[in-house]
C-alpha cells in the first residue's frame, strides 16, 4: 500500500513550527548524497512544501492527507512519477515572534546560514531513501540536524554568525534594543570592517 509518513523524533524537546519539504530525484551517485543540497530553481531536483504549526515530539505526518495543501516545483505533488526515486524530508524551523504591535509572525531565525535554509544550523532532515515511488510505504524520520560548525562559547549568540577576525577584516556584532523591543526577541546588527593595508 502506498503511503508517505514523516515522523518527528521523540528527541525533539520543543514544539515545531515551520516548512516541511519533501524532495525527490532520480538516483545519481555523481550528485551530492543529500537531496536538499540539490535544490535549485534553475536545474535542481523537484521539491514540495507544506507549512505546519504545533508539531510535537512523536507526531507523524501523513503527507498524502496534506496533498491539497502542498505546493511544488517544477510540477505538482500529485504529478510525481511512479518509479524508482530517491526521497528525503527536510524541515525549515520557524521561530515565533510576538511583536510589540500585537502581531504574531513566524519565520526562520538565521543562525549564521546567511538566509540559506540548506545551511542554517538546527534545521532538520531525514536519511535519503531509494524507493519504488507509488508502490510502497515510505517512512522518513527527521532525526538529523544541520550542526553549528563551531563551538558556541559563553557570551556568543548564533545570530549574524561568529566569524574570526583576520588581519585586515574585523567583524562586529551589535545588539539593537530598538529592534529587540519591537520583535520581543534579541536582534543584532552585523558589520564587517575592512582595515587599510599596514593599519596599526
Predicted features and spans:
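Short acidic/polar inter-strand loop motif in beta-rich domains
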Residues: 29-31, 91-112
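A short tyrosine-centered beta-strand micro-motif
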Residues: 78-94
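Short Trp-Ser/Thr-centered turn/loop motifs at beta-strand boundaries
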Residues: 107, 114-148
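Contiguous beta-strand segments within globular domains
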Residues: 1-8, 12-21, 190-191
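Contiguous segments within soluble domain cores/interaction surfaces
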Residues: 21-52, 56-58
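A beta-strand/beta-hairpin structural motif
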Residues: 52-78
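Short amphipathic, basic-aromatic surface patches that mediate peripheral association
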Residues: 4-13, 26-35, 178-179, 195-199
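N-terminal cap/lid segment of alpha/beta-hydrolase-fold proteins
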Residues: 11, 135-200
Amino acid at each position: 500500500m502506498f503511503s508517505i509518513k514523516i515522523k518527528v523524533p521523540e528527541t525533539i524537546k520543543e514544539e515545531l513550527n515551520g516548512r516541511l519539504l519533501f524532495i525527490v530525484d532520480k538516483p545519481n551517485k555523481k550528485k551530492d548524497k543529500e537531496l536538499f543540497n540539490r535544490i535549485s530553481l534553475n536545474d535542481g531536483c523537484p521539491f514540495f512544501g507544506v507549512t505546519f504549526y504545533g508539531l510535537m515530539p512523536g507526531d507523524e505526518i501523513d503527507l498524502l492527507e496534506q496533498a491539497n495543501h502542498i505546493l511544488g516545483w517544477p510540477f505538482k505533488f500529485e504529478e510525481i512519477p511512479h518509479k524508482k526515486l530517491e526521497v528525503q524530508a527536510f524541515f525549515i524551523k520557524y521561530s515565533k515572534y510576538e511583536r510589540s504591535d500585537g502581531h504574531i509572525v513566524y519565520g526562520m531565525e538565521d543562525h549564521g546560514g546567511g538566509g540559506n535554509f540548506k545551511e542554517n544550523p538546527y534545521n532538520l532532515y531525514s536519511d535519503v531513501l531509494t524507493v519504488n515511488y507509488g508502490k510502497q510505504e515510505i517512512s522518513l524520520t527527521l532525526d538529523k540536524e544541520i550542526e553549528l560548525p563551531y563551538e558556541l562559547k559563553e557570551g556568543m549568540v548564533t545570530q549574524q554568525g561568529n566569524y574570526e577576525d583576520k588581519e585586515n577584516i574585523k567583524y562586529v556584532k551589535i545588539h539593537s534594543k530598538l529592534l529587540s523591543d519591537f520583535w520581543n526577541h534579541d536582534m543584532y546588527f552585523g558589520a564587517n570592517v575592512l582595515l587599510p593595508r599596514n593599519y596599526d
